[in-house]
């Protein structure tokens, strides 16, 4: 499955209700997730994008992988306090999200995805 580009509406249907996030985290997904916060003009984001797309295929049915354009979805970026891009947000089942700054290599991202599905 290809990566899914999230808008505010998609986020509220698949990830969490924005108005509830200030008081509690309640993940709506049925599998762990990864969200890649990016911008089209960002060089490191452009280098990371094909890796994220490959991982979406590799982890299809195990981890849902999303992308959020920070320029188009500023509110979503603010929710996770995205200050630099790329930023990756790992969402385990039943736990709080893990926010990591900067581009990572495929191997490092795979390690973290594998930890999500254990």
Please report, for each region that a protein language model flagged, where it lies by residue:
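Short pre-active-site segment immediately N-terminal to redox-active cysteine/selenocysteine motifs
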Residues: 30-33, 37-41, 84
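A short glycine-leucine-enriched loop at secondary-structure breakpoints
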Residues: 79-83
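N-terminal targeting signals for export/organelle localization
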Residues: 1-12, 114, 118
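Non-catalytic, surface beta->alpha helical segment in thiol-disulfide oxidoreductase systems
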Residues: 84, 89-118
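Thiol-based oxidoreductase modules, predominantly thioredoxin-like and allied folds used
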Residues: 5, 37, 49-56, 60-75
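A short beta-strand-turn-helix
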Residues: 6-33
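Conserved hydrophobic/aromatic "anchor" residues
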Residues: 11, 37-38, 91
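Cys/His/Pro-rich metal-binding microdomains
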Residues: 43-46
């Amino acid at each position: 499955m290809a990566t899914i580009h999230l808008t505010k509406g998609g986020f509220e249907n698949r990830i969490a209700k924005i108005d509830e996030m200030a008081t509690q985290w309640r993940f709506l997904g049925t599998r762990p997730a990864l969200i890649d916060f990016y911008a089209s003009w960002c060089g490191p984001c452009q280098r990371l994008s094909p890796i994220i797309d490959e991982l979406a295929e590799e982890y299809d049915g195990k981890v849902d992988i999303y992308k959020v354009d920070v320029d188009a979805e500023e509110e979503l970026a603010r929710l996770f306090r995205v200050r630099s891009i790329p930023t990756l947000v790992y969402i385990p089942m039943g736990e709080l999200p893990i926010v990591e700054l900067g581009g990572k290599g495929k191997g490092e991202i795979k390690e973290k995805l594998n930890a999500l599905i254990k």
